[in-house]
Amino acid sequence: MSFFDSYRKKMQMPSKEEVLPGRVQPIPTAAAHFVSGHPLKGPWPDGMKQVLFGMGCFWGAERLFWQVPGVYVTAVGYAGGITPNPTYEETCTGLTGHAEVVLVVYDPKVVTLNELLALFWEEHDPTQGMRQGNDIGTTYRSVIYTFNAVDRAVAEKSRDAYSQALASRGLGPVTTQIADAPDFYYAEDYHQQYLAKNPDGYCGLRGTDVSCPIPLAH
C-alpha cells in the first residue's frame, strides 16, 4: 500500500466487515481519579451531569476539563465506533471506529454546559475532519456526545454560533459530529489522567484563536 493509500485509509471510517471483534469483558482500568480521588465509574453525587468530548489526543483534553471548577471527575476512553471493549492498540489501528474521548461528569449548579462547550470549541480546531494537528486518523476526530435531547440542542446551537465566528475569520466549516451518547469504553489505567502522572507528556491541543460567542449561562 502506498503512502497516499495508507493516508486515505486512515481518514475513512471502517466498514462493519473491517472492524476488529473486541471482547465481551471490559479492559482493566483505574478505580479512582488520580488527581481528585473521586470514583472513575461512580457512583457520583446526585445531580451530576455527563458529556463526552473528542478533540484529538485525549491526554491533553482530559487535563483541560479536570481543572475546571464544578467538574467532579473526568475519564478517558473510546466511543462512537463498533468494536466492544477495545484496547488502545486496537483503537489506534482505526479499525474499531472509535474516537478518543473524555467523559466529563460535572455539577451544573457550578459550571454550565455552555461553559464546557466554550472550552471545547476554543481549545482545539473543529474544522480538521479526521485529524487534529499532527494526530491523523478517525480516532482523533472532533465529537460531542450528549446524554439527553436538551443538551444535544444546546451543543448544536453552540456549534452554529461558533461556525459563524469561524466564518467571520475566513475559517471553517466545522466538522464536529454531535450525537446522542453511544457506549463509552474506559481506556486503560495508564491513560487515565496521563498528564498528571507525566507532566511533560505530549499534549496536542491547539485552538484557532477564535473566541466562542455563546452565552455561558444556561
UniProtKB/Swiss-Prot annotation:
Reactions mediated catalytically: L-methionyl-[protein] + [thioredoxin]-disulfide + H2O = L-methionyl-(S)-S-oxide-[protein] + [thioredoxin]-dithiol; [thioredoxin]-disulfide + L-methionine + H2O = L-methionine (S)-S-oxide + [thioredoxin]-dithiol
GO biological-process terms attached to the record: cellular response to oxidative stress; protein modification process
GO cellular component entries: cytoplasm
Residue positions of the active site: C57
Keyword annotations of the record: Oxidoreductase
EC annotation from Swiss-Prot or TrEMBL: 1.8.4.11
Keyword Oxidoreductase attributed: yes
Domain of life: Bacteria
GO molecular function: L-methionine-(S)-S-oxide reductase activity; peptide-methionine (S)-S-oxide reductase activity
Coiled coil ranges: none
Function of the protein: Has an important function as a repair enzyme for proteins that have been inactivated by oxidation. Catalyzes the reversible oxidation-reduction of methionine sulfoxide in proteins to methionine.
HAMAP family for the chain: MsrA
Family of the protein in this entry: Belongs to the MsrA Met sulfoxide reductase family.
Protein name per Swiss-Prot or TrEMBL: Peptide methionine sulfoxide reductase MsrA
